[in-house]
A protein has these predicted regions:
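Basic, nucleic-acid-binding surfaces and adjacent catalytic neighborhoods in DNA/RNA-processing proteins
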Residues: 22-50, 58, 63, 159-289
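Short histidine-centered catalytic/ligand-binding loop motif
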Residues: 96, 139-148, 200-207
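A short, charged helix-loop
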Residues: 124-164
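Catalytic cores of large soluble enzymes that bind and process phosphate-bearing ligands
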Residues: 2, 6, 149, 209
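Hydrophobic, well-ordered secondary-structure segments
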Residues: 102-104, 114, 137-140, 170, ...
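Acidic, proline/glycine-enriched N-terminal capping motif
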Residues: 1-136, 278, 282, 286-289
């Protein structure tokens, strides 16, 4: 699933291509009986309302909240897209790739260009909300603070994670109600850098290591954005291109490989933590319990 860096990369791409453009038509082939009573475009009745409110509107800008893409329109409504497992947006003339061929939605603009949505497993969530009600909507109201905000300092980081004092740190880092945007990939990389075992109990981890985690979190997420996201799986940017963060993994999906930490001779292992995989070095990542 795309995490904070992949979603931010997509938002940056939207602002460089479709910001200021007017939507002139929409097409989609989502239609699921499981969404008949939901406010998503997979519900044909909601899609009819969606089209009516979106066509003819100018895109003011795109933003990110956690793993959600927010496309603000001129009529004070916002298109919310959660890409889920396999979704990604593609702008006109994108690079051809098998992962870019599962088109289930597109927007056409006043310049004749299109914005496509590829979603191989059709899990994505796409809806429309009044912009003024976004913050308190069921989609965003539960989310924790943004880890890259300037105001998100160590004190807040420490406080948020200690809301789950007996939780395993890998699981707690991925809890979207505590900190928004961190998932499987980046939690592994954060813990590798901080030297903390993924099953360490939160309230047993020394403050020194929490400070290392905080520093690692800022560095890893920024690095993820700098490298255009992670395309170990099927994520692509709006040009249809792969990100490059997967070339810089130190833990995630490196099972059986020698640890890259200087002076460490550990071998990366993989375990399951609360149904999610965790990759770590058993030599330099300390277990606190």
């Amino acid at each position: 699933m795309p995490e904070l860096p992949e979603v931010q990369t997509t938002v940056n791409g939207l602002n460089s291509t479709v910001k200021g453009r007017k939507i002139v038509s929409i097409w989609n082939d989502y239609d699921s009986p499981y969404f008949r009573n939901k406010d998503e475009i997979k519900n044909p009745k909601f899609y009819a309302k969606f089209k009516k409110l979106v066509i003819g509107q100018k895109i003011l800008k795109a933003e990110r909240r956690a793993k959600n893409i927010l496309i603000h329109l001129g009529n004070k409504h916002t298109i919310l897209i959660h890409m889920k497992m396999t979704g990604h947006l593609l702008y006109e003339g994108y690079k051809k790739d098998p992962f870019n061929s599962h088109i289930h939605l597109y927007f056409q603009f006043d310049n004749g260009k299109h914005l496509y949505f590829s979603d191989m497993r059709k899990f994505a969530k796409i809806t429309l909300i009044e912009t003024g009600k976004l913050k308190h909507s069921i989609h965003l109201s539960h989310l924790g603070p943004e880890p890259l905000d300037k105001n998100f300092q160590f004190k807040i980081f420490n406080f948020q994670l200690h809301k789950r004092p007996k939780g395993k740190i890998k699981q707690v880092l991925m809890d979207q109600t505590l900190i928004a945007g961190i998932g499987n990939i980046y939690s592994d990389e954060i813990l590798w850098r901080a030297g903390v075992h993924p099953t360490s109990q939160v309230n047993k981890i020394p403050e020194k290591n929490f400070k290392e985690m905080f520093k690692a979190m800022k560095e890893v997420l920024k690095k993820g954005i700098d490298f255009g996201g992670d395309s170990m799986s099927d994520y692509r940017n709006i040009k249809g291109e792969k990100g490059r963060f997967q070339e810089h993994h130190r833990a995630y999906q490196r099972k059986g490989k020698i640890c890259d930490k200087k002076g460490c001779k550990g071998v990366i292992q993989r375990i399951i933590v609360a149904t999610r995989s965790a990759h770590f070095c058993p030599t330099h990542q300390k277990l606190f319990k």
